[in-house]
Amino acid sequence: VKTSSLGDIIHALPALTDAARAIPGITFDWVVEEGFAEIPTWHPAVGKVIPVAIRRWRKNIWQTIKSGEWRRFKQSLRAEKYDLVLDAQGLLKSAWLTRYVKAPVAGLDQNSAREPLASRFYQRRLAVARGQHAVERLRQLFAVALGYDLPKGLGDYGLDVERLIELPRNKPYVLFLHGTTWDTKHWPEVYWRDLALRMGHKGIEVRLPWGNPAEKARAERIASGLGNAVVLPRLNLAGVARVLASASACVAVDTGLGHLAAALDVPTISLFGPTNPGLTGAYGKVQIHLASDFPCAPCLQ
C-alpha cells in the first residue's frame, strides 16, 4: 500500500527490484491513488494495480458510498489471498486500508512511521531508522518485512527505459520541469528564462511540459520570443515519461516529475529551497542537487 504522491510512489520502485531479485517469482499487487495508477505497471514485479480515490472520495463521501464505488474497492482488496500486506506509507489513511485485506499486515513501528498511530493497525511493526533518504528507508522496510539481506549500493528502479525512448531520436534537448506544488518550491521565472537564453546561445533546444493552465501560462512566458524554447502540448504521465526518457538532460524544481527523471536515469540538476534533498531528493545516477543556503532552509514550509 503506497497511495501517493508521485515522488513517493517512484521512491518505492527500487524496493520492489530488491525483493524480486532476492525472492524469484514474487509479485506485488499495489494499492495506489487513481491518478498515479500507471506508474506501478512499469515495474515487472507488479501483478495487479488496485486504484484508490481517497482524494476524490473525501469531497463527497455519501456519493462514494451510494454509487457502490467504495464497496467495489473493498471487494477488489478481498479478491486475492495474499501472504502479506505491507503498508509502505506509514500514514493513518494507508493503514486504514489494510483493514480490508485478509492477510497479515506489516508496517513501520511507532518510532519509524510518519504518523505513529498508523502502527496500531499492523501485526508486525518494523523499525527503520529515520534521517536517511526515503528510497533507502523503503528498501530497508521491504528487506526486513520479507526476510532478505539489503543489497549494497545504489537502488535500481527496475524500469525498462529503452521501451520509452522515442526512435529515431530527434536532435538533443533539455527538459525544464518548472511546475511544483508549493509556492516556496518555485524557481523565479526570470531565472528559467535566462537559463533558456543561455542554452539557446549554445544551440540547445529547451522543452517545457505543463499539467494545468497556470503551468502552461508560465511555460509560455518562459519561452516567449526564444527560438530554442518549445512549449509542449498537454501530456499524460506516460507521455511525459517518454519525453523525459529521450531528453539529454533535465533541470527541475522539487517535483514528482524530477523523481521520474531520476528513475529514468536522465542527468538532472534539481533545485531545492524549503525541502531537504538528503531525505527526499532525486535519487539515482547523475543527479545533482543545488540547495538554498538561506539560514532557514530546509524549513519544510
Give, region by region, the residue ranges found by the protein language model.
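Catalytic machinery of carbohydrate-active enzymes
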Residues: 1-301
